[in-house]
């Protein structure tokens, strides 16, 4: 018991010093251009009018459908959710003991009553609304056997008070790509869209270690 009383404050103190999740770093290899495009291609003499890399049919447009092709993702995300919960319950017990009688005498000292009552009432309300508008240019990193494009890309903005980054990954059907090589973010399957930042502005929106300590799930109050 003594050891428990000593370890509990230490654990709570460490919870308050817990660091937030590490932010992503620049120059991530996962978001680099496809490796097979970095290797120099063999130069072939095809004449001045014909280039194998840019060959396409007269009935075919220049939409992105090959590894390394570039397309623009139009970000149009809007979510809204709300939830409300309420719980209440109560329990009440009453028990009375009559005065026993022995040889015609009542033993008043042994009489009495016991009662107990417990009540709980809790309620919670949660509401969240998110909106993201903009655009980001990504590259095709893989073409699946069924023609679905695996896209991936990032954008970093270095500002006076820190950095902001945006990352998009997911699967896109080639048929959903418009003629101007753009696609809506709502057409991306398994989409992973990240928009965050780091620096002075981001630190100002982060809770300090003492606030995290009191808001930690292990805090008893």
From Swiss-Prot:
Membrane topology: Lipid-anchor
Gene Ontology cellular-component annotations: bacterial-type flagellum basal body, distal rod, L ring; cell outer membrane
InterPro entries for this protein: Flag_Lring
Entry annotated with the keyword Lipoprotein: yes
Protein localization: Cell outer membrane; Bacterial flagellum basal body
GO molecular function, one term: cytoskeletal motor activity
Positions where lipid (N-palmitoyl cysteine) attaches: 17
Coiled-coil annotated spans: none
Pfam families: FlgH (PF02107)
Quaternary state and interactors: The basal body constitutes a major portion of the flagellar organelle and consists of four rings (L,P,S, and M) mounted on a central rod.
Similarity-based family: Belongs to the FlgH family.
Role description: Assembles around the rod to form the L-ring and probably protects the motor/basal body from shearing forces during rotation.
NCBIfam families (alphabetical): PRK00249.1-4, PRK12407.1
PANTHER family hit by this protein: FLAGELLAR L-RING PROTEIN
Protein's recorded name: Flagellar L-ring protein 1
The species this protein was found in: Yersinia pestis
Gene behind this protein: flgH1
């Amino acid at each position: 018991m003594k050891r428990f009383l000593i370890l509990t404050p230490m654990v709570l103190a460490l919870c308050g010093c817990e660091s937030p999740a590490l932010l992503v770093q620049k120059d991530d290899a996962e978001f680099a251009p496809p490796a097979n495009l970095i290797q120099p291609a063999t130069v072939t003499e095809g004449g001045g009018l014909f280039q194998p890399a840019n060959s396409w049919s007269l009935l075919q447009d220049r939409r992105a459908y090959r590894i390394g092709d570039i397309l623009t993702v139009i970000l149009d995300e809007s979510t809204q959710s709300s939830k409300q919960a309420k719980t209440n319950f109560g329990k009440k017990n009453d028990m009375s003991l009559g005065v026993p009688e022995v040889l015609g005498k009542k033993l008043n000292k042994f009489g009495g009553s016991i009662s107990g009552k417990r009540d709980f009432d809790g309620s919670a309300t949660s509401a969240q609304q998110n909106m993201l508008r903009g655009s980001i240019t990504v590259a095709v990193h893989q073409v699946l056997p069924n023609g679905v494009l695996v896209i991936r890309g990032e954008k970093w903005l270095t500002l006076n008070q820190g950095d902001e980054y945006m990352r998009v990954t997911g699967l896109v059907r080639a048929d959903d790509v418009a003629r101007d090589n753009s696609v809506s973010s709502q057409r991306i399957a398994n989409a992973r869209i990240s928009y965050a930042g780091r620096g002075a502005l981001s630190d100002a929106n982060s809770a300090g270690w003492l606030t995290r300590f009191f808001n930690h799930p292990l805090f008893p109050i």
